[in-house]
Amino acid sequence: MRWPWSGDDHEQNKSSRLWATSPKSSDWPSTLVEPRTLIATLALTVSTVAGVRLYKTYLRRIPTVNHIKPNYFRRKSLFGQVTSVGDADNFRLYHTPGGRIAGWGLLPWKRIPTKREDLTKQTLHIRIAGVDAPELAHWGREAQPFSKEAHDWLINLIHNRRVRAYIYRRDQYDRVVAQVYVRRWLFRKDVGLEMLRAGLATVYEAKTGAEFGTVEDKYRAAEQKARDSKVGMWAKPTLRQRLGGAPTQPPESPREYKNRHNAAEKLKKPG
């Protein structure tokens, strides 16, 4: 006797329908080329390839200059946070692709390190393109006038801030030469241009390695205006400074300073 509440007839009919619509083992090849199967497979493949490409193009972090592909130069920009300012025209950048939109600074696994040991081999050494700032004391050379002021000015402008670097090339010191922008309030500022306007840098004058992008004329005009306005290193010494022995002639440019020291060091070498 059939159990009155079992519903066996309904379950049996449902099972029969499922088996009737299920493909037989011999039908699998034809099932794989059905439009709905092909569309689903194509959609999965396209989304996977697009995701990988999106990651490699926009979200892959570049820890050091050795990880920059040659075809990136003059085509890509790098967004990140300045972790240190070593000199008046270069700094260290921790690359944060995608910025806050990608979770940097917000998600626990996307925190920017603060300890020096955690930043080892994790930052890019950026050289600001198109400008040359007064040299700090190093390698036994004396500091140039206004080198500390220029260094302090750059620290105040970019240290611990997010910047975007439009990368041009890798130089002989494994630095990335780049035009750098920083946002202050609602405005985006060209760091090199602002240094020239403040009279704390000159246009880069080396015979080789100069990089300006499309702004060389603008940079030269900014330097000339700073000279004419007597700001920064171009300011005339006060009476007190002159009495204290400050030079009254035009200041030595960073390029002249380097040339003078390089010539003196060559004379010291034997032979």
UniProtKB/Swiss-Prot annotation:
Keywords for the protein's UniProt record, in alphabetical order: Calcium, Endonuclease, Hydrolase, Membrane, Metal-binding, Mitochondrion, Nuclease, Transmembrane, Transmembrane helix
Binding site for Ca(2+): D132
InterPro entries assigned to the protein according to its UniProt record, in alphabetical order: SNase_OB-fold_sf, Staphylococal_nuclease_OB-fold
Chief localisation class: mitochondrion
EC class of the enzyme, as a word: hydrolase
TNase-like domain sequence ranges: 76-236
EC number: 3.1.-.-
A molecular function GO annotation: endonuclease activity
Extent of Basic and acidic residues compositional bias: 253-271
Annotated TM spans: 38-55
Subcellular location: Mitochondrion; Membrane
Record region (Disordered): 1-27, 226-271
The family this protein is said to belong to: Belongs to the LCL3 family.
Entry protein name: Probable endonuclease lcl3
GN (gene name): lcl3
